[in-house]
């Protein structure tokens, strides 16, 4: 028992510190880190604590069609690492057309979302020097999806993006 008590104290103390660190991280990022989302991960180059978690959460939320939470997660990652190009890519991706916002059965983007997505895409490109080669490929592929013109047809952009994604998926089968 004399040996067990100090061990339990150390284990308890360490677990409390980890919990406090997580709470501090959440407060600093301004968004929750949610549990139970699965284990999908896309390894990014940022080494800033918490950015990988928020990026993964943003991507999972985008894949789950919860774009508002996806955007919030990517913004939290950006807040922690303002030089994370792929984090701005993620927000631009989540701002794009999706099945939750339609008109006459077609996915649409609001004029503001079109401007915001284009702006985030340009921010990712401006930070591309901080990106890994794989991240650069993803960023440059998404560039074909947006043009900043709220009045232009999305059809050629969607076709160009689909073609660029086909080439990207051939390069990265994972």
Write out the residue ranges for each language-model feature:
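Sec-dependent signal peptide recognition
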Residues: 1-7
């Amino acid at each position: 028992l004399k040996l067990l008590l100090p061990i339990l104290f150390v284990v308890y103390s360490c677990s409390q510190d980890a919990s406090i660190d997580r709470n501090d991280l959440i407060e600093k990022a301004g968004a929750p880190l949610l549990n139970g989302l699965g284990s999908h991960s896309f390894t990014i180059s940022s080494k800033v604590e918490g950015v990988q978690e928020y990026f993964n959460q943003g991507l999972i939320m985008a894949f789950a069609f919860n774009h508002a939470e996806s955007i919030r997660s990517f913004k939290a990652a950006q807040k922690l690492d303002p030089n994370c190009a792929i984090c701005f890519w993620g927000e631009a991706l989540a701002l794009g057309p999706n099945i939750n916002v339609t008109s006459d059965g077609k996915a649409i983007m609001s004029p503001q979302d079109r401007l915001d997505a284009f702006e985030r895409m340009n921010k990712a490109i401006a930070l591309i020097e901080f990106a890994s080669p794989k991240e650069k490929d993803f960023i440059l592929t998404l560039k074909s999806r947006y043009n900043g013109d709220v009045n232009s047809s999305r059809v050629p952009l969607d076709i160009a993006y689909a073609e660029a994604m086909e080439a990207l998926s051939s390069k990265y089968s994972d």
